[in-house]
């Protein structure tokens, strides 16, 4: 939870309701209100609802619940003459900027909003840092984000004399806290005017030149960081909340100096999330319709359309909490009100039993053992160089490069096993069943889990027929009369491989391993391999039950 302190009278004035009503509506948004004194309240907000970290963001959400405003908020957006040139900044390579004109906002609240974003999406400024400047005091319409030497001088925020960046790191609290994040090789990231004057050294401190005051209504906002997505989301969150305070958003041209590519910032990107009516009914246990679902989505300040019977929700980028379908369902529950969802007693007379997939996998393992194969078990993680497809899940910051990817097939693991057991008595017959993660563009993540089984034989002399016979036996024992269609790929010898089909559905692959692949794995003997797609087999067998 993230805690913010707001003036309750200013907040209530934005939405024209009483305090008890405010508390009830915030409870629906998974937030709690605690009074501090006569004028101020403390609000605990879920850490994923970054758009609610200011009074204007809260007001926007509550206006939707009150049906004073429905759907995504519309803001005044205009082009400006301002340009941000992004140079090659090695420690924090991404930057975007925007202008906001005539926003009527409490300065203390704006600073609180900025720091709460630093602590959440910004990961204490390590991932994202925000600079907010008084536009009146920015002299140049061309701003550059670049590396500067530590000898650069400027007056830091609330300072009264020029200091070098080195001195700022040594003498200021911000320098001591955040200097180690971005300083490297004797240079610092900096936001600089075209005359060379420094406006800020993110993520450390702004220049005193563009300090905000009570009369500031026009803002220049820069966001820098290590993740482009987080930078774009953060900027959208800030400018949309300032626009709720009456501001007009000004676009800034962003030029990447290395390749001259141009963006118009803020990006205001949206995501389309499809929602199934039956899924909503199942999760919430309610009777509803597509139209009613769309109404609740609109109350949660997102746009919703029904196209060809499909509910399409348009998610604004500042709603960083909406990752997939279940998050939209949660928003629908908030719109309905948790207190309005009727609890029902769940009565079950079912007895525990094995999942069908577990039983099928057990059967396949028993058949493999019965066919004379020894079961092995490899890690789900693997070295990416061993994979045959470039569509796989890469591990960020792996503990070791030997396990830097998630396997998308069982075949590389079997080949790796064979390469390490060439000294064993021949023939070697092994198999494995287990999970892989395969590419699937139809899913939210672009990948899905798949259950598979793979079989391998290595001997002084071995051919396609040696593996085809036991595989056919296993599939026939499962009740599948399959056929084999010649199909070449980079794993097997051309003309000595096939795909396994049942009623035009691919159930697996089989073939003699290509000598180039054997050399790649350091295998000196011929090998044959088959891989069965258990998930697909399960679908077919389930349909036959």
From Swiss-Prot:
On subunit structure and binding partners, the annotation says: Tetramer of two alpha and two beta subunits.
Species in which this protein is naturally found: Saccharolobus islandicus (strain L.S.2.15 / Lassen #1)
What GO terms describe the biological role, i.e. biological process, of this protein? phenylalanyl-tRNA aminoacylation
UniProt entry keywords in alphabetical sequence: Aminoacyl-tRNA synthetase, ATP-binding, Cytoplasm, Ligase, Magnesium, Metal-binding, Nucleotide-binding, Protein biosynthesis
Q: Name one GO molecular function term.
A: magnesium ion binding
* Reaction it catalyzes: tRNA(Phe) + L-phenylalanine + ATP = L-phenylalanyl-tRNA(Phe) + AMP + diphosphate + H(+)
What residues does Mg(2+) bind to?
321, 327, 330-331
Q: State the name under which the record lists this protein.
A: Phenylalanine--tRNA ligase beta subunit
